Amino acid sequence: MIIYYKKEEINTVVEELKSQQLTIGFVPTMGALHEGHLSLVKKGLQQNDIIVVSIFVNPTQFDNKEDLEKYPRTLDRDVNLLKTVSDDIIVYAPTVEDVYGKNITSSKFKFNGLEFEMEGKFREGHFDGVGTIVKRLFEIVKPNNAYFGEKDYQQLRIIQTLVKNLSLIHI
């Protein structure tokens, strides 16, 4: 298992893998991994030559700074959990600056009104933050396939809408 912290590093690796015609599966996470995440990783390993797991607590999807500060950051534990699945996992654990530079802001997206329903009523800008990080991570990792849990159905639908609207990859 190799952990990359810089997008330039992961870009180099991805370009090399793509030049070998290998398929890349991607499981974006905010860490604090559990069995649901591991099942996505296992599925990705079955369906792709390579699997990349990102572990990144995204500040733009938190509307409350306190919630962001309290969010668990358990990289060592997460890596050990991933090792129980396979040693052939690439981990991308960037810093906020690596992903956003000095401008930590969200892009604005239209999700066919989904962003204003359910959770979106109470967390203004949350889904713009989700859309921003998913788009940025896809641009960095350049996966063929991506895997998302279904526990948060609204977020899954938001991501599916983003992928469709921007003509991104298969999820």
Pin down the residues of each PLM region.
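Positively charged, low-complexity intrinsically disordered leader regions
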Residues: M1-L22
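N-terminal catalytic cores of NTP/NDP-binding nucleotidyl/phosphoryl-transfer enzymes
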Residues: E15-F62, D67-K70, M118-V130, L137-F138
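Short secondary-structure boundary segments
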Residues: T29, I55, P94-T95, E150
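Active-site glycine- and acidic-residue-rich loops that bind
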Residues: M30-L33, G149-I158
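Short amphipathic alpha-helices and their capping/turn segments at secondary-structure boundaries
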Residues: L38-Q46, D78-V79, T84, V163
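Divalent-metal (Mg2+/Mn2+/Ca2+)-assisted nucleotide/phosphate chemistry catalytic cores
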Residues: E69-Y147
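Acidic, metal-binding active-site segment of PIN/NYN-like and related structure-specific nucleases
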Residues: V141, A146-Q154, K164
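Conserved small/polar residues in nucleotide/adenosyl-binding loops
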Residues: I169-I171
